[in-house]
Each structure stands twice: as structure tokens, then as C-alpha cells.
Amino acid sequence: MGDRRPQDRPRSQGMDSKPWYCDKPPSKYFAKRKHRRLRFPPVDTQNWVFVTEGMDDFRYACQSPEDTLVCRRDEFLLPKISLRGPQADRKSRKKKLLKKAALFSELSPVQPARKAFVEEVEAQLMTKHPLAMYPNLGKDMPPDLLLQVLKQLDPERKLEDAWARCEAREKTTEVPTESGKYPCGESCPRPPETPVSRLRPQLPKTPVSSRRPEPPKTRVSSLRPEPPKTRVSSLHPEPPETRASHLRVDPPETGVSHLCPEPPKTLVSSVHPEPPDTGASHLCPEPPETRVSHLHPEPPETGVSHLRPEPSKTQVSSLCPEPPEAGVSHLCLEPPNTHRVSSFLLQVLKLDSEKKLEDARARCEGQEMTTEELTKPGKYHFWESCPRPFESRMPHLRLVLPITRRMASLCLKPPKTRRVSSLCPEPTKTGASHLKELFQEDTPSTMECVSDSLQRRHTSRKLRDFKWAGDLGVNEESISSLFDFTPECRTTDQDQKIKKANECASRLMYGMELDDMDEVEFLRIKYWDRRRRAAPHSYSAQRGRIRYGPWYFEPKLGKKLRSDEPLIDPKPVLEKPDEPDILDGLYGPIAFKDFILSKGYRMPGVIEKLFAKKGWTYDSVKTPIQRAVQVYKYKEDVTDASKED
């Protein structure tokens, strides 16, 4: 039968063939037209513009479209090439999900919950606790005051270490100081502080007691060293201070108490600093004598100094129990350095916006005001000692003295004898052991604790010999004013100015002190500064668009113009008469032309341009030399004929 399916019939070439300009498609960088098919720009008849012949005059405005057929033209004749490839429309870029499509999105409900959880954790980590900026808050602050701050600012007890430290200190302070509760050598907890200033309590005087009674006040100043800090706690009696030797019997190191007679008092005294208020019991143990003594930091209240002589001992001796050897020291534990507590607490209390801690704020402000009043210069004479600063309710605030050479020079050294070395062996400590214990190392914390009032108080003792100067009306202000600079001599930043070479004085410019090389360098700098200065009428380049006339002008007629200047009319330029040449009215060029022609030489270009410009010919314009020669020759002939006759 055969295949009966309709076979494809051949078609003519014109039905499916494309035009010749579509065989090779244009570049993809050509900007596509909207709503119509892309055409090659020269072939697109809608962009054709028919213009008239001749030159257009665009001096005042565009040409009138009377004789010009202008078709609609949306774009320029040449194709636009974009740097980026063809891009889709902005509206079509954004893919918005419909309401129904949002329900069937690929995001699971767990992902938004996880995202919210991560944001919450990041917010908790980023927000810091208000007290997190002060890591040493518990060390530099008294426990009672820190506990009040923590109750208000940290009710959730996030700072566990600070809460535990404060509660532990409160428990130790609440336990009463009962006698006999603690064995020998252990430190007794500190009794609760009161608003009363930290004075050493007066103990009752008993015939048999390990406590030392307060001595009467006499004119002789008492100097008593501070007990050294050793590992073995012991209560040493004070050795006899005589001119011959120091007799001291060390008791055996046992737990049994011994009778330690106290020596009689002599005129020589020891420096005695006020012991710090700590948690230790208020017993006054006598330390062993060392080579270096200490100054008493407490100033005298009146003109009469404190007299603290040792009371005369009787046959009844005082009981001085010797504690066993242990790691616990008999000295009070050193409290933390809290000199900056007031200023530090004011910064912390700024977090208390509701001002609930009014007592703490008042205590801090009062402490700062008292320290400012005492450190004002010129309040006391230089031979008078500054009174002791006001004792605040801060129990751990202790002032530490600096180490100076003047302090070391005032230290009293007891005489050394053989009997001392045999009976009382020297302790294994350096000569400055007590000095290191009393005057701590020069750390930043200790140096900041030293106030100007303490320095003035210790240095004033040496100045008492100059009391006669005070009777004459000389005080610290009058002396310091002699060494003070006046406001005229004080330099400021405004007065400091670097002068140029031409601003120097003439005696410095032409001085003989300059060497040859220095003078050359100086002159070079001087004239270099002068060259940098611009002339008053110098040309300054102005940024602007410059053009050289229309494109149909001849290059010779082109002129440099700004974009805002009008164009030059070409017709007057062409019809403008030539300017008179300097050779036009001269007789010499015409005579020179005749001379060249008579000799048969080649005519110079200057003469050719002159005759071409004027439109002259060589025969029409001649000099009257020939006529003059003929007239002159005729006259000569006439004269010769007359002579012959």
C-alpha cells in the first residue's frame, strides 16, 4: 500500500527567510527597545533626519524647522552601548509571595523559633550587669557598705562571690571578742566599728596584767617602733633602753606564759605609730628592738607633744604568754587599700537612679569634702603641723606613709655593744625590715593614698627651728610666691608659633654667626618662600568647558571661546576687509620688484604675496625711476648740445 501520510511540500525561500540584516544578530550590549522589535539603528527609518544643504547658523537659537523634515527620534542615531548586560525590569526582579503561597512555603515553624531564641541569647550576652564594670568591687569596698549596694542593685544575687564575701565578713564581725575563746597566737576577729574615731581604748591598770597602761604626757616626745610582721606570733617585752646596752631575755618558745619584767624608762624614746584598726585584739605587745626606728605619724594636738614614757616596773611582773610556733601572726591583718572608696562609690552609686542609698552617698560626699579641706595649701604655717584628718566611718581606710630620705635621717639607732650581741641575738632581718613593713612598697595604690597634708606634717618637724621666721610674718604663701611664675611669663599654646624666615629680625638675618653653608641654606629658604607667592595679576586656571568655534569654520577662523560665549558670525569674518599692511605705502618694495625684474632673478615670496593681496601686476605698478632717468638723460643731452654750440 505504501505510506499515505502527507509529505512535507517544498516551500519558497521568501516565506521563512529572514532579511539580510537579521542574519547576524546585533550585539547583546545594544539597548533593547520597549514594546517593539529591535532594529539596527541605521536601518530604522524612524530615526532618519532630513537636513538642508549649507551651513546652519546656531549662534542665537536652533534653526527653524520650515525647510527641514524632522522625523520622530527617541534616541540618538548611533546605538547605545551599555556597560552592563541586558537587565530585567526592577519590578519583575522582586518576587512576592501570594498569601496562599506563603502558607505553603519551605520554611518550617522551627526555624522562626530558633531565630528568636538566638536573638534572645545574644541580647542577654550583650547586656552587661550594672556592676560587671567593677570586678574589684568587693576588695576595694567595706563589707557593710557593699552589702547595702548589692541589696539594691543585685537583688537576684547574680554576683555570688561578692554576696558570699560580704556575708562571711558579717558573720565574723558579729562574733563577740570574748577573752580566752581564741588560743595564743590566733588573731581575734574585729569588733564592730562605731562612728567614733579610731582611738586606742584606755585599758585599766592592774598590778598584774599583760596590757600596757597609757603613760602620762610630758614634754619628752615618745617614739615607739611598730612590731615587725613575722610568721611566729609572740608578745615580746620592750628591752631596757639605756646608754650602756640593751638587755633582753627571750623566753623559750612554749605555750607556758613567762614573767617578763619591763625595763625602766630613760630619756631616749622610740617612734610609735598608731596601730591600724583591724580585727585583732587591742593588746599592745612590745616588739623587739631593731636598728631602724619609725616616726610617729600622729601629729601633736597642741604645742606640747605627747609623752609616752614607759612606766617604772615593780617586783610584780606582767604576764606575757608565749604562743606556740604557728603560721598565724600576732599582728593585725593588713586591711585592703580603700583610699579611693569614696570616689569609686560615687561612680557606682550613679546606677542608683532612685537614690535609695542616701546614707552611702552622704558618707562618700562627706569624705571627699574633708580631704579637700585638709589638702588646701597655705592653711597652716610651715612650722605648724597639720591636724589629723577627719576619721570617717570607713573602717578599713588607712593612710600609708612614703619612704623619704628625711624620714630615714630622723630614725634613732640604739648603741651596739657586745653584751647585746651575746644576750640578744639579732633577728634575721635587714636593717630596713621595719621600714618596709611600716612604709609599704611604692605601688600605685600606696602612692595614691599619700596626701599632701601628711607630707607637710612630717617635714614641718625639721622646720621648727625656723619659728623666728613666723614671728616676722613669713609664711608658706609668701615664700612660694617668690618662686611662682607671673602670668606674663607663663607660656600658652597660642604664644607658640613657628616664625618664617622673612619674619626674623635683621640682626639675625645678617649675623656673623652663620657659616657659609648655613647662610646659603638660609637664603635658599628665604627666596623659596618668595617664589611660592603668586603674582597679583597672574593667570589662574579656571575649570570650564572650552570650544573653538563651530565645526564648519576653517581652522584659521577658529577661536578659543568659553561655552557660555556666543559664536562668531562667519559672514562678517569672510567679508571683513584686510588690515593695511606696512609694506603698502612703501616705495622700496616696488623699486625692489623692478630691480629683480631687470636683473632676471626669481621674485621673492614677500613681494609675490603683496602683489597678490593687492591684486596688482608687475607691469601695472612700477616706480617712476625710468621716467626720471629719461628726463635726466634728456637734460644731459640738452646741456651737451648747448656746450658744443
Curated annotation (Swiss-Prot):
<feature type="compositionally biased region" description="Basic and acidic residues">
    <location>
        <begin position="238"/>
        <end position="251"/>
    </location>
</feature>
<feature type="compositionally biased region" description="Basic and acidic residues">
    <location>
        <begin position="1"/>
        <end position="11"/>
    </location>
</feature>
<dbReference type="Pfam" id="PF14642">
    <property type="entry name" value="FAM47"/>
</dbReference>
<feature type="region of interest" description="Disordered">
    <location>
        <begin position="1"/>
        <end position="23"/>
    </location>
</feature>
<feature type="region of interest" description="Disordered">
    <location>
        <begin position="168"/>
        <end position="321"/>
    </location>
</feature>
<protein>
    <recommendedName>
        <fullName>Protein FAM47B</fullName>
    </recommendedName>
</protein>
<comment type="similarity">
    <text>Belongs to the FAM47 family.</text>
</comment>
<dbReference type="InterPro" id="IPR032743">
    <property type="entry name" value="FAM47"/>
</dbReference>
<feature type="compositionally biased region" description="Basic and acidic residues">
    <location>
        <begin position="288"/>
        <end position="299"/>
    </location>
</feature>
